[in-house]
A protein has these predicted regions:
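Positively charged n-region of N-terminal signal peptides that target proteins for export
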Residues: 1-5
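Sec-dependent N-terminal signal peptides
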Residues: 6-13
């Protein structure tokens, strides 16, 4: 017979492994600039961050903080970025506002503008003391143009074929600017060569360095180094230098060592195509982006329902869901209104998998913060959005929303049923029904709860507005719970408690 203590240990281990984190992205240097204004003093280093800022994140249910943009940058990228015009995103900007792309990394050491490696250790300790974790960037595709390795070991990079000197594609020394196959080259970075064995080792070691300071890594454009994608993007250059396709994927090669040393590391892949999402998950990523959900949320309730009802628990369990991040426009801008942005945020946060929030999302901001800048255009917080997220974040701390179980509700009825999105979330003794009116029209729908327990009358607790209703169990189970909502309104019902 299994020892009781061992059984409890195994059960807790399974519970911990199944729990999905609530991630909060912060653009580091703009946040320090924001805090300087908030507190009326210079806050430029990580150790200057007032500790109550970490307390605030913890109180609101954040479990992992992605500090975006902490690594050392090159001067080339900064000077390059200062040649651009940012008036469309920041009217009245000055050269002092330009801080350089955080993705033009020269070395995986702390950017001296924000501190030292010891400050990164301090940051992680502050989060750990509050039972939160730290995520940092790993940028596999490219480095700064003036990274030390560009001069010391150019074969680590994709190089121009002999006789090619296109200044839009290659540096003066013949190194390829980084690129995505669908866009023009990024001329502030140069492209690592993943078909060069030595490059693979260098980049595996860089990932190990990131994880020596963090509990997880967000891997920028992780799909670009897949052999199929990389080979197609750089076919001309690879053939010219006689490279052949590696026998395995870089991620498979790197994760063998990474996971042996850091078995609990959370690895998040930025990726967009469905086949790439599934492949990266199979190769060992903990989570992958689900950008398609955001695309659907910008549309109609039919598009959202059609997307989510075909997805499996497994898919929701290994994907990260968001309505904004540093790459995307603000949710309020994309959705067209504060109310639709809140509805979209509710869906993205309650479906399962990694819950992914962005700094400023809770404030209902409309203006995007450009990654090259230390500040965005000034705007006021939306009080209603802030209060709504304060309530939602408390709800999301329930195990039902960080667990794995998800059930789409198919058979709704009522005059506005086609405008409603509904699904069940549960974990152990926690049971919830999420209902969102994803339209501008008020209306009602009957939403069946197939697994509601008991007979007779049952108390159903709507937790967003903290209201209890007494309803007949048989009616709820067979005909549905009647839910009437204003346009873009969400309600979350707790039952079986």
């Amino acid at each position: 017979m299994l020892d009781k203590k061992l059984f409890i240990f195994l059960a807790l281990t399974i519970l911990i492994e199944c729990k999905h984190p609530i991630l909060y992205e912060i653009s580091t240097r703009p946040w320090l600039y924001e805090l300087s204004k908030k507190y009326g003093k210079s806050i430029t280093k990580l150790k200057d961050i007032p500790l109550e800022e970490f307390d605030y994140l913890k109180e609101n249910g954040i479990e992992m903080v992605w500090m975006m943009g902490v690594w050392k940058l090159g001067e080339y990228g900064l000077n390059f970025d200062k040649q651009s015009d940012y008036s469309s995103v920041l009217p009245g900007w000055t050269p002092d506002d330009v801080i350089g792309s955080p993705y033009a990394i020269s070395e995986y050491t702390c950017n001296p503008e924000i501190g030292t490696n010891d400050d990164l250790i301090w940051l992680r300790e502050q989060l750990h003391s509050r039972n939160m974790k730290l995520m940092l960037d790993f940028v596999p595709n490219h480095s700064a143009v003036d990274a030390p390795t560009a001069a010391s070991n150019p074969k680590l990079y994709v190089r121009a074929p002999a006789g090619k000197n296109d200044p839009k594609r290659y540096t003066d020394s013949g190194l390829s600017y980084g690129k995505d196959p669908y866009f023009d080259p990024w001329r502030d970075v140069i492209q690592w060569n993943y078909w060069e064995e030595e490059t693979r080792k260098v980049m595996k070691d860089n990932l190990m360095t990131v994880l020596s300071y963090a509990d997880g890594a967000r891997c920028d454009m992780a799909h670009l180094v897949l052999n199929d994608v990389f080979g197609k993007t750089w076919e001309e250059e690879l053939n010219a230098w006689g490279y052949t396709r590696p026998v395995n994927e870089f991620w498979e090669y790197a994760f063998n060592e990474v996971k042996a040393k850091y078995p609990n590391a959370i690895l998040l892949a930025e990726v967009y195509e469905e086949w790439e999402i599934e492949l990266l998950y199979k190769l060992g990523f903990t989570y992958t982006y689900d950008k398609a959900l955001l695309d659907k949320l910008e549309g109609t309730p039919y598009e959202v329902n059609d997307y989510i009802h075909y997805k499996t628990e497994s898919f929701w369990g290994h994907t990260a869901h968001f309505v904004e991040n540093h790459d995307e426009n603000r949710a309020v801008f994309n959705m067209g209104s504060v109310e639709k942005a809140k509805a979209a945020g509710t869906v993205a946060a309650t479906l399962g998998g990694m819950i992914f929030m962005n700094h400023g999302q809770w404030s209902g901001y409309r203006n995007k913060l450009d990654v090259h800048l230390r500040r965005g255009a000034d705007e006021n917080e939306d009080y209603g959005t802030k209060k709504y997220y304060e309530r939602l974040m408390k709800i999301l701390q329930d195990p039902a929303f960080t667990g794995t179980n998800y059930y789409f509700v198919y058979n709704m009825s009522g005059d506005r049923k086609d405008d409603f999105i509904a699904y069940l979330r549960e974990e152990g003794d926690s049971h919830y029904l999420v209902v969102v009116n994803y339209s501008n029209n008020s209306g009602c729908a009957n939403v069946p709860i197939y697994n509601i327990e008991g007979n007779g009358d049952h108390t159903v607790h709507e937790v967003v507005d903290d209201v209890e209703y007494i309803r007949n169990v048989d009616t709820i189970r067979n005909e549905g719970l009647t839910v009437c909502l204003n346009g873009w309104q969400s309600q979350i019902f707790k039952y079986n408690y």
